[in-house]
Structure formats: structure tokens, C-alpha cells
């Protein structure tokens, strides 16, 4: 089961007050519902491929409208994966339900935006967002390369209204048009965890945070290892270059031709090619030399070798 599916399953098990049940139901029906007229009677089908969400819709309708007759049907998809499709159907009193949820007005006028009457309380704003996520939401697993949570809407007006509702909780949500509709999305991991908290997905929130922290720790360790590796490669590369230059000088003019301080370091570097500059300085018999002092002498040796390669006579290139 995907992280999004696990999160939705958790949400379908939450207990809610009547006002919040109404708000959540309004989002689910607005986003997943379809209307039909049969024998001059308005009917409502709410469709989903998620059995837990279908049961949630059925339960919420019976809670908010206990006297209404509701059917829960199962159909088999005939195309592609042939998954089950679940229908929550109202053949009667659909108009009453839709008006009560502020989805339609008089004359069957459909309201595309979220009614303030439905989300007047903070708890109901949270519940509407929960219903919207159940109906059209998705969330990346926190292990993936990028954090992303989105809610899909067919209609631009509802998408704008939904984005405003999310941002009433300072979630920094943004809107985007898609090929077949519109989305409101969040990219920041901290805001995604806030959203999960708002809609009541606390187990999903804890899992998301655990994975995110471990992921950040791994990334920090990897950056540190990469940095250490780069430094090591740089050190090894410098040591190999120094040895190569010292051997070149030995072949061309002999190490005895070097000033005493340079010769000491040159001979030590040839004998101890894998030690650090600090360790090399501690091996000087005439007295310890600092890391910067060793580095200075080796630079002089490098410069001398480069001058000799360029054809500068040894006498004029010898450091004083």
C-alpha cells in the first residue's frame, strides 16, 4: 500500500462531530459526485476506487442525514486494471442533501466555491480539507527525491477556493492548471507535515517526520563523506605530484644540489609518501617544522621542477 493510501485509510477511521462530518462530506461529494436525472428525479452518485473512502462517504451521509436512503454499490471496471469501482448512490432526496451542503442553490445552480457556512469554524475548515484530500489528494512517499502534496479539482473556482482555505493555515499552498483540471499543491516538507496535522493524519505525520529526519541525516553524512573524500583526493594528488617533482629534480640535478631545508623535506617525502604535511614536519631531524612551513618548502620544490621543465637553467632557478 502506498503512503498516500495508508494516509487516507487512517483518515477514514477518524471520529468527527456533526458539523465537521458535514464539512468533510461536502468536499467528498463536491469533488467525487456526479448528478443525473431519472424520471424527473435528481440522483447523486459519489464514485471512488477506494473501498474505505466509499464506506466513509456512506457513513457520513447516514450520520448527517440519518433518514435518507443510501445505497453502496460495487462495479467492476472493464478497462485497464479492471479495479472495483464503488458507488454511493442517492436516488431520492439528493437535492435536499446538495442544498444542505451548499453545493447547489435554488434552481439547481451549482456553487463552485466553498461556502463560508460550511467552514465557519476552524474544526470544519480542517474537516473540509480532510474530505478534499480523501477525494482528490496525493502525497509523495517521504523517501522520494522531492516532497510533494497536491489536491486535484475539476473546476478552477473550487481550486482557488481550496487554495485560499489551505493558506488560511499559512501552508504556502500554490495553484497550477493541469491538462484535465487544476491542482493546489505544497512542496515544503514542514508545510506538508503541518497539513497532515491539520487534517488529523497523525500516524502518517509521525512516519513522514521519521523518514524525513533519517533522510536528512543520510544526506548530511553523504555530504560529509563526499567532502572528506574530495579533501583526501586533493591530498593524495598533491603528494603524488610532489613525489614526481622530487624524482624529476633528483634525476636532473640531484637532490644534493638543493638547499638543505628543501633537501630534508624532499628526502622525507620520498620515504613517506602517504603521511600528512603535519606528520612530515615532525620527522625533520633539525627540528620540527609547522604544516605551513612544510607546505612552503614543497611549493618551492614544485616551482623549481616546473622551471627546469620549462628550460630555465638550474643555477638561476635554485631557491635561496
Curated annotation (Swiss-Prot):
Q: Does the keyword Cell division apply?
A: yes
Q: What GO MF annotations does this protein's record show?
A: DNA binding
Known DNA-binding region:
276-310
Which keywords label this protein? Cell cycle, Cell division, DNA-binding
Q: Which GO terms describe its biological process?
A: cell division; regulation of sporulation
Q: Which InterPro entries match?
A: Homing_endonucl, Sporu_reg_WhiA_N_dom, Sporulation_regulator_WhiA, Sporulation_regulator_WhiA_C, WhiA_LAGLIDADG_dom
Q: Which family does it belong to?
A: Belongs to the WhiA family.
HAMAP family, per database record: HTH_type_WhiA
Physiological role = Involved in cell division and chromosome segregation.
Protein name (Swiss-Prot/TrEMBL): Probable cell division protein WhiA
Q: Which organism is it from?
A: Halalkalibacterium halodurans (strain ATCC BAA-125 / DSM 18197 / FERM 7344 / JCM 9153 / C-125)
Amino acid at each position: 500500500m502506498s503512503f498516500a493510501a495508508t494516509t487516507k485509510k487512517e483518515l477514514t477511521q477518524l471520529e468527527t462531530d456533526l458539523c465537521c462530518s458535514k464539512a468533510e462530506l461536502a468536499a467528498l461529494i463536491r469533488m467525487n459526485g456526479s448528478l443525473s436525472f431519472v424520471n424527473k428525479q435528481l440522483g447523486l452518485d459519489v464514485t471512488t476506487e477506494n473501498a474505505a473512502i466509499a464506506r466513509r462517504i456512506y457513513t457520513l451521509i447516514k450520520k448527517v442525514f440519518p433518514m435518507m436512503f443510501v445505497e453502496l454499490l460495487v462495479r467492476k471496471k472493464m478497462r485497464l486494471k479492471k479495479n472495483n469501482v464503488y458507488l454511493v448512490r442517492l436516488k431520492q432526496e439528493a437535492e435536499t442533501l446538495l442544498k444542505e451542503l451548499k453545493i447547489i442553490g435554488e434552481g439547481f445552480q451549482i456553487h463552485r466555491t466553498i461556502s463560508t457556512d460550511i467552514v465557519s469554524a476552524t474544526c470544519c475548515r480542517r474537516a473540509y480539507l480532510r474530505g478534499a484530500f480523501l477525494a482528490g489528494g496525493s502525497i509523495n512517499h517521504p523517501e522520494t527525491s522531492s516532497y510533494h502534496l497536491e489536491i486535484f479539482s475539476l473546476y478552477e473556482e473550487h481550486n482557488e477556493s481550496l487554495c485560499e482555505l489551505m493558506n488560511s493555515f499559512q501552508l504556502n499552498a500554490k495553484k497550477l492548471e493541469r491538462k484535465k483540471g487544476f491542482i493546489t499543491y505544497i512542496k515544503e516538507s514542514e508545510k506538508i507535515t503541518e497539513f497532515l496535522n491539520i487534517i488529523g493524519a497523525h500516524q502518517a505525520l509521525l512516519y513522514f517526520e521519521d523518514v524525513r529526519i533519517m533522510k536528512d541525516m543520510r544526506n548530511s553524512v553523504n555530504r560529509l563523506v563526499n567532502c572528506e573524500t574530495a579533501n583526501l583526493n586533493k591530498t593524495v594528488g598533491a603528494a603524488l605530484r610532489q613525489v614526481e617533482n622530487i624524482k624529476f629534480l633528483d634525476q636532473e640535478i640531484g637532490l644534493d644540489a638543493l638547499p638543505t631545508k628543501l633537501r630534508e623535506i624532499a628526502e622525507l617525502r620520498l620515504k613517506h609518501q602517504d603521511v600528512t604535511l603535519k606528520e612530515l614536519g615532525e620527522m625533520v631531524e633539525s627540528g620540527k617544522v609547522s604544516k605551513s612551513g612544510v607546505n612552503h618548502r614543497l611549493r618551492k620544490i614544485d616551482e623549481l621542477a616546473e622551471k627546469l621543465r620549462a628550460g630555465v637553467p638550474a643555477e638561476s632557478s635554485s631557491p635561496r
